[in-house]
Amino acid sequence: MVMSATAALDVAKDLIGESQAARRELDEVDRFLAFDNPVDVVARKAHVSPDHEKNALARFSHTPLLQLVVSEVAQQMVLEGIDAGADDVSAAMWRPFEVNGLVSRQYALWHATVGYGEAHVMVLPGDTVYPDEPGRAKAWMSAFSPRALFASWNDPVEDAFPAFALRTIGQPGKKSVYRLYDDEAVYFLAQDDTANRGLSFIQYREHNMGVCPVVSFQNDMDLEGRTPGDVEKFKIPAQRHDKTVYDRMLAQHYNSWKVRTATGLEAPNSDEDAAAQKFKLAHDDILTGEGDVKFGTLPETQLTGFIQAADADRDMLAAVSQTPVWALNGGQLVNLSADALVEARSMQRLKVGQKQRANGRSIAKAARLASFAEGRYEDAENFNVTARWADVESRSLAQVADALGKIVTMLGVPPALVLDMIPGVTPAKAEEWREFMRANPSETERLSATLNRQLTYGTNV
């Protein structure tokens, strides 16, 4: 049943407060994911009265390691298709992802999921139809950051869809536009604080989806329903690294050279005389003294300890985030066997695989919801849908060809079935090759077909 205007306003007011509280936490995370520099916060906490020079050093000391930790995972999560049984069914369920541009924008979806802890995809019936299916409307799908779309759950662990979703659309000035979603309709609301109008109800539109049309993608949901992002989990080790680099920058800026001293010199009679003597000194002058005059030097601060401490902090971040250390330090691996290289990346593969499994269910839900929006109700009831991820493991084409060739020759797997396993070959290209193979069978296949006909119908065939 569609909510009344009063009920929609009451729900929206509660969700606006909750979403703003969540937004403040996400804004702090966004400082590490966006181009803003969060290190000045560390500097202000570490020093009571920082000056402009130290603030500049704090900005220089920031290394965006958390951006790299998140991006390094998101870049390996490449969704290239859906398996739903028959090829035509799989193609139909994958088509909404393609026509809505989610295939090309999936990196942003995974980046938000891993970085913030969750992201959302909204699915609604569209206004346009497929050119080859005039009677079928396209499903509309779009990905949203949790900063723009807030999902409210009755039970985030057990429920497949949220109870409500609130989309915030910023406007110039102190104005905001909201869209509230439930399992029946979308409610349009607006707020204008400049005119003291508060929150007002505009209209509603039924979407006929039967559920709140939002699919959530979680990073690491536990049994308590918590979904921390990688920034939240690894922020402390990253800040520790920035603090160590900042200390090194201070020592490098103020104490990285020898200080020459002279004692026993006759002091100038006035400040003017002292300034005049300094003005007369040149860089290559040699000073001498008599009597009790002594010259010496104060050693510079050694930076080796700071550099080693920063390396240790970086390595600790790599360990706790299951990130290969060479991905953070730019180092090169040399003199390692193929098996050693595979083992060196094993923890990272486990991490990426876990996130792929966790989000595979959400991909299947989005595919079924899009099928329902397009009127393909049988596909919407297909619970055998699985996500097909691209193999991004670094291998040479010769290694892949050798492995697939052995699968075909030793196990008797038809060559047409392994085309999708070739890196870089899209499902469309693999299908094109299969059609060519069916239209142009090999000599062995033609001979086998002839022999089968002779065995079936006799030698006169």
Each predicted region: which residue ranges?
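Long, highly charged low-complexity segments enriched in Glu/Asp and Lys/Arg with interspersed Ser/Thr
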Residues: 422-455
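Extended, regular secondary-structure scaffolds
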Residues: 115, 120-228
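Extended, non-catalytic structural segments that build the interaction scaffolds
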Residues: 30, 37-51, 55, 285-320, ...
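Extended hydrophobic-aromatic, low-complexity segments
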Residues: 326-329, 397-398, 415-419, 428-432
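Glycine- and charge-rich intrinsically disordered segments
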Residues: 1, 242, 249, 253, ...
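A glycine-biased, small/acidic residue-tolerant capping/turn segment at secondary-structure junctions
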Residues: 365-387, 430-434
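Extended, charged amphipathic alpha-helical segments
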Residues: 200-343, 384-387, 392
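Extended, helix-rich architectural segments
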Residues: 1-140, 460-461
